Amino acid sequence: MKILVFYIYLTFALLSPFIALFNQSADAREAENGSAAPDLAFGAYQRGDFKAALVEAKKRLQINPKDAAALALIGQLYIEGAGVNRDAKQAMDWFRRAADLGNAESAYIYGAALLQGLNVPKDRHRARDYLEKAAALNHGSALHLLGEMALENEGKPSDFSRALDYFKRADAAGNADASYALGVLYKTGKGLDKDLNTAAFYFKRAADLDLSAAMVEYAIMQFNGLGAPRDQQAAIALLRRAGMAGNAVAQNRLAHIYAEGLGIAPDLSQARYWRDKAREGGLADSALDFLSSVRGKDGLDKQELSAPTAPTQTKTQSIMPPTFQAPLKK
């Protein structure tokens, strides 16, 4: 049964792309490239002097044509249109060359692009090859995407065993989306025994990494004492954190909490505020039209636990590469 839906962010964001691509020390780059020269290319990029960054990166390639980090930097400049005319297709060629020389981030970017046919011909098999290159270097996002591919499995029954392996490796590498995916699998009992305690554990790991969808899931479990110790005040605080990050589901839950006085004193002003924020985020709720009470006072309705969580870009999701989110259908 096909249970995976891809929510794909295809825009290459400009927020901290240097950190996303080149989170290596100067010593590590020197060891990789066999060069002890000052890192003029990356220094220029960080200063915003993109034309100088391109010149210096090309100088590095003249010295060492196999300088994968310099190749990746040029790809970054072309994908941004920083110091050059934006040319996504040319950027992909630079990323491919860097990937072929062992640059993990470039292998992930190019593999993800191949998977979707983004500025390159769509090719699922080559995509897997490049993602596996990145995964072999413990790239968390590549491992997570391979896990999602195992669930989607080209329309065939999901390969849960393979997906779990990828997700757990990605989780160990600190990938929030993988932690969230594991939480969903344990919560729904897809491919393994249902275990709310373990689900809550993984949702909390993802929430601690600022993934707002996971904040919502963990907060609801915490509010109801399902899989996590009941703590309504902490749950409300976590929902506020997710709501302030722009998660419409969190905003909707907060509106109900304030309207009905669940765990706190009723506050219709706050209820209206969060209801309106959720509407702005695309989540309308007729039950809140007049802030009417639709749930009991003992906790959030069981329906809350199965409500879909709207994907919302967070710090971990707004970096340069295409990010694939996959809320699972029951």
Placement of each model-derived feature along the sequence:
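Terminal, low-structured helical/coil segments at or just beyond the last alpha-helical repeat
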Residues: 34, 265-330
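Structural signature of tandem alpha-helical TPR/SEL1-like repeats
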Residues: 48-55, 85-94, 121-130, 157-166, ...
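Canonical positions in the second alpha-helix
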Residues: 59-60, 97-98, 133-134, 169-170, ...
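Ankyrin-repeat and related helical/solenoid repeat scaffolds used for protein-protein interactions
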Residues: 216-281
